[in-house]
């Protein structure tokens, strides 16, 4: 059985207003040692991404690496000069997707982490760092604590009109509550 490794990367999120539930960031950044002693090399994902494309599929989007908690789908995965840039869409029709979205908007969760199998890796004898030359990417998770501190969600899109409406309703409810005393009756 193949062994899967989990590693996380991070980058701060900024809310956006176009499509609710859509977010982007770096699932992995090249040349950055994570807290497990791994550094992903440029090009490490190329073969895996091509294999996913040839099958017409994408890696899973999970919540905290829990295979029983898929929360959305990856709409864009590409290597650039920085790392593995991803864009995804949370499923806002399911509880877990809504909860993940609220965490992203609040900034309480903004880490990204990859689940992968190392196909080719080289260990630096002096530093002990393992350089990942090629990996099979299995999944990318939203996580609280990424192994790679530079693997973060960069943007979160939300419906400002929707959140503005809820804010106005909340403000109105507070004004009503402040203006009217609450009475409790007993029989």
Task: Label each residue range with its predicted role.
Residues 2-4:
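Terminal, non-catalytic protein-protein interaction segments that mediate quaternary/complex assembly
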Residues 39-42, 74-78:
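Glycine-rich loop at the start of a catalytic domain that most often binds anionic cofactors/ligands
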């Amino acid at each position: 059985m193949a062994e899967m490794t989990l590693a996380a990367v991070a980058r701060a999120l900024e809310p956006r207003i176009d499509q609710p539930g859509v977010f982007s960031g770096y699932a992995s950044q090249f040349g950055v040692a994570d807290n497990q002693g791994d550094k992903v090399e440029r090009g490490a994902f190329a073969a895996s991404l091509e294999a996913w494309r040839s099958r017409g599929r994408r890696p899973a989007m999970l919540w905290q690496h829990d295979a029983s908690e898929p929360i959305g789908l990856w709409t864009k995965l590409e290597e650039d000069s920085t790392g593995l840039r991803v864009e995804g869409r949370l499923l806002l029709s399911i509880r877990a997707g809504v909860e993940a979205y609220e965490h992203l908007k609040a900034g309480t969760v903004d880490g990204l982490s990859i689940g992968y199998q190392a196909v080719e890796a080289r260990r630096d004898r002096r530093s002990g760092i393992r350089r990942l030359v090629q990996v099979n990417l299995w999944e990318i998770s939203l996580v609280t604590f990424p192994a790679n501190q530079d693997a973060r969600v960069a943007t979160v899109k939300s419906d400002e009109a929707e959140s503005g409406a809820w804010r106005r309703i909340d403000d109105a409810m507070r004004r009503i509550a402040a203006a009217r005393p609450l009475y409790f009756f007993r029989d």
